[in-house]
Amino acid sequence: MSLSEPKPHAPTPDTAQQRTPVTLKALARMAREGTPFACLAAYDATTARWLERGGVHCILAGDSAAEVILGLPRTAEMPLEVSIALTAAVKRGAPNTVIMADLPFGSYHESDEQAVRTATRYIREARADIVKLEADASFSSTVAHVTRAGIPVCAHVGSLPQRAALTSGYTSAGRSADAAIEIIKDALALEAAGATMLLIEAVPPLVTEALLARTRIPIIGIGAGTAAHGQILVVNDLLGLTDAPPRFAEPAEALGARIQAAGQTWANRVKERNIGGQAYTMPAEQADLFRNRLAHLDETTRDKPSS
């Protein structure tokens, strides 16, 4: 099978256009009914369009773009303006999918008012459906203010990538009884503050199951077992584009190797002057006219004295 040949089961643009829009209410209904929903973090319109066609219910325009798109060393370095632009691109690519904005580090920490201003920009400028922020119980007031402004909030608990600098790198969470209890307390406080949804990251499945039994809002898991209402991965990890993916991220494809092979094929084609495809043509009479005019141009240029 060639790189350009679609797999037999791949959705076509015609069938993709028939998709019913997914909403936050639809995700809540799926959670109540015990139907898992699929989420992925993605960062551009083209990828978002294909994910929507593939049936993904929610796309997070994650601050992980700092690393996988911008090449920065940490998610905490994600620029706000770039994040808003990428979120808007994802929304344009997948208009019938729930789009979750990821508030960057420093864009909501100064005050509740700053958080409302930042969240409002994502809703207005990027047309996001919901905003996500990394939080513990101390951010309950922030969640309450943003929610009171009419903006749905997904509270991110467990392992918090934006705080990696405090933990000397990305790490799991909730692996001791005390740590697990703190995560449960955080989540309950954030739900009480008005969070529409929770995302729990890199915790033992036991912690996720305990949280599910004590909350009434949808929970998305990443590296948190299989029990959560929804599951999310970074699309680069799913596609095999990451050199060292997290232990919980099993690739569904090996696109990194295929992209590398395609690059090698193109380099060889260019070297051999055999780039493929079809060249544009010129009608014979126009080609003759062009040659005549080109000869005249050459003669005129040749006779022109040099300065």
Where are these regions (language model features)?
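Alpha/beta enzyme core
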Residues: 2-307
